[in-house]
Amino acid sequence: MSDGDGGGEQGGGGPAEAEESALVLGRLLDRGAWRLKVAGVEKPRRDARLLAGHVLGLSPGAVLLADDRVVTPEEAQALEAVIARRETREPVSRILGHRGFWRFDLALGADTLDPRPDTETLVEAGLAVLEGCGGRILDLGTGSGCILLALLADRPGAIGLGIDIAPGAVRVALRNARALGLERRALFAVGDWAAAVAGPFDLIVSNPPYIPSADIAALEPEVARFDPSRALDGGADGLDPYRILAAQVPALLAPAGVLAVEFGQGQARDVAGLLEVGGLCPYEIKKDLSGEERCLLARRRAAGPLPPIHIDAKPSAPGNGPTKA
């Protein structure tokens, strides 16, 4: 339905008809999408529909078929409120309070990073490490628990510990574990990286902050304003967390254990170098679906020279089910 001029009163209708026309969902979506477009939102129509579905309790498909639906004044007011929030560039996932990741719908909080589809590359790499076995998993900087919970869901014999410095993030991760029925195999605790953790672990995973401090202000508003800064800020060069991991992880890995870490664009060689200095042997780099180098795997160093790092020729395959917007 287009914005148009309405036309209701010109056809002889009275004030009641005009008021009803103003509450037709299609018209509200047109106006909402226009406002979001002006605000610089990348996909204004899609986001307006998602928000309408949230307010009205409708699936995205049902919203597409509901242009002629007349909403109540209360529903129109609620839709106006969430459109106004999205106008500020608050992400839809933050407004809804949840985000699709792997094949789950996970709760978010003010202290958790909004999980990205690219991070599913890290999950796929971890699952390959644990192929055919259980294992003990440590997730450093767990946030919403998305990585650890995805690994545990697909490796029923595994158990895991997630650490985050933010108590609010730990509470969200616990909530997600309970919602997925994984609370018996997933423990979460507040901690400063692995400072108070005892190993050994068969797999250690981390998606640490890796944005250089000076670059954060230039990120999309959805990220710079609404993701917690401590989940983004990797220090002056974006590599401070990897220095911590390089110092702490070797002592926590089992003899055949593996560290899998996510990193930012152009950071692969620097991250590999830091891990080598810490006593690890980086052996493989995984690419995400867009073809960007995204994930590095390293193991405890054996005697002798370091072998060359293998780089995937192709991006990793999609995970178990599409990532939901």
Swiss-Prot record:
It is an enzyme of class 2 (transferase). The keyword Transcription does not apply. InterPro entries: DNA_methylase_N6_adenine_CS (IPR002052), HemK-like (IPR004556), N5-glutamine_MTase (IPR050320), PrmC_N (IPR040758), RF_methyltr_PrmC (IPR019874), SAM-dependent_MTases_sf (IPR029063), Small_mtfrase_dom (IPR007848). Residues 306-325 are annotated as: Disordered. It comes from the Bacteria. Its EC number is 2.1.1.297. It catalyses: L-glutaminyl-[peptide chain release factor] + S-adenosyl-L-methionine = N(5)-methyl-L-glutaminyl-[peptide chain release factor] + S-adenosyl-L-homocysteine + H(+). One of its GO terms (molecular function) is protein-(glutamine-N5) methyltransferase activity. Keywords: Methyltransferase, S-adenosyl-L-methionine, Transferase. Coiled coil: none annotated. SUPFAM superfamilies: S-adenosyl-L-methionine-dependent methyltransferases. Substrate binds at residues 207-210. Pfam families: MTS, PrmC_N. One of its GO terms (biological process) is methylation. S-adenosyl-L-methionine binds at residues 141-145, 164, 193, 207. NCBIfam families: hemK_fam, RF_mod_PrmC. Methylates the class 1 translation termination release factors RF1/PrfA and RF2/PrfB on the glutamine residue of the universally conserved GGQ motif. Belongs to the protein N5-glutamine methyltransferase family. PrmC subfamily. This is Release factor glutamine methyltransferase. It comes from Rhodospirillum rubrum (strain ATCC 11170 / ATH 1.1.1 / DSM 467 / LMG 4362 / NCIMB 8255 / S1).
